[in-house]
Amino acid sequence: MRYTFSNDLGTLFTIILAIGFIINLVLAFIIIFLERNRRTASSTWAWLFVLFVLPLIGFILYLFFGRTVPARKLNKNNGKVLTDFDGLLKQQIESFDKGNYGTDNKQVQKHHDLVRMLLMDQDGFLTENNKVDHFIDGNDLYDQVLQDIKNAKEYIHLEYYTFALDGLGQRILKALEEKLKQGLEVKILYDDVGSKKVKMANFDHFKSLGGEVEAFFASKLPLLNFRMNNRNHRKIIVIDGQLGYVGGFNIGDEYLGLGKLGYWRDTHLRIQGDAVDALQLRFILDWNSQAHRPQFEYDVKYFPKKNGPLGNSPIQIAASGPASDWHQIEYGYTKMIMSAKKSVYLQSPYFIPDNSYINAIKIAAKSGVDVHLMIPCKPDHPLVYWATYSNASDLLSSGVKIYTYENGFIHSKMCLIDDEMVSVGTANMDFRSFELNFEVNAFVYDEKLAKDLRVAYEHDITKSKQLTKESYANRPLSVKFKESLAKLVSPIL
């Protein structure tokens, strides 16, 4: 029997389809059964949808974006560091359980249940001797950062999702190199995907001066990174153990308003005081999870006695990610919203939370709480942008006021309630930040800071458009289609 070329193609196509079917079947089994404890039901269904619609392409996407790193791979070499803070956490938990909150601060007493919940995290010990300044403009922020680097005496630790070596990045790198020449310890931890244009070779001069650099989840293969799903989205600076920074600004010219999105509106905190110990602890834990050289452990020089009374702003630092036992920041946000009596002000560039978070916001609004949500008017990630808008209908119907920021790009991640307390940090209000990425937020029980940030929010409203039920209902059919498609896959964005 003679075989034609078309017969061969048909046979080959059949074999490819069979292989694709088997791969999809195996992958579906893995997603449903083997990873059920590390994946939500909505995420499971979203991945099954992708595999069904895009059989072979879906498999490739899963290799890059679907796998979650086991916690045991991230918690190595940290026993000694954690042990030194276990006693403090245990003591505070026991005191709170007895109704002894250890402070006269009214907001800590009022929100003692939130404080108690955050104490369940290894970074979450409560500190009160703190002074907090806030920044909403990148130029102001990095002018202060560069001044603080210049004034450093012993060491500087930086941990960033994006460390772009453009104009701003070079200024910071040169400032750090000057401190190395003065004999200071300087360490940089950057995310390999968030800083994708950065190569380790870019730091050769920095390292020749004694600086240390690590890339978080660096790929061993060029152009291929199979750990893209779990990224270090944290932004932390610690200087001399006396002051620290945490918030939404990355390092790069874009965050000074020089990118295609225009003015960059974000929120960042500068903290002086005991809460810096928690930021230092977080940096050490993250560094130790990636470092190829000998680890560094608890040392009094990294947790020094602070320079006298600094302020009275109680702070807890909360970190979450694949290595965490539970979703600390998401639950912190949710607890704040559910405890609000008067007002809630939310800002997030990506708003794709799960139903429980959406329901908390709806319940607050239906209970008479004045709830505000601010999101971007322009996309930096189109699919995420449409998924964000897909949640608007339910929220508007519940009485939530939604604003689209028109004066550039809103990148701030903030939850503020009752002009009493606020959470600021790196966590967006979406599935990726709540479950997949490594994030860090400060929960600050400070009326002055809360009121200052509410004033900034009200100024942002003057630069925004309010989204109404009428305008949302009249959006084009093409927009409705994009939102529906984005909503289907939103749990895996």
Predicted regions and their residues:
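Helical hairpin unit composed of two closely spaced alpha helices linked by a short loop
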Residues: A340, Y350-H372, P376, H381
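Short alpha-helical functional segments enriched in proximate histidine and acidic residues
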Residues: Q347
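Short, solvent-exposed amphipathic alpha-helical segments in soluble enzyme
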Residues: A360-A364, S390, H459
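Catalytic-core elements of nucleic-acid end-processing and repair enzymes
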Residues: K413
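N-terminal localization/anchoring segments of enzymes in phospholipid and broader phosphate metabolism
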Residues: M1-Y331, K335, S339, P379, ...
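Active-site donor-binding acidic/aromatic loop of nucleotide-activated sugar
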Residues: I402-E406
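Histidine/acidic-residue-rich catalytic or RNA/ligand-binding cores of hydrolases
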Residues: S356-I358, Y385-A387, I417
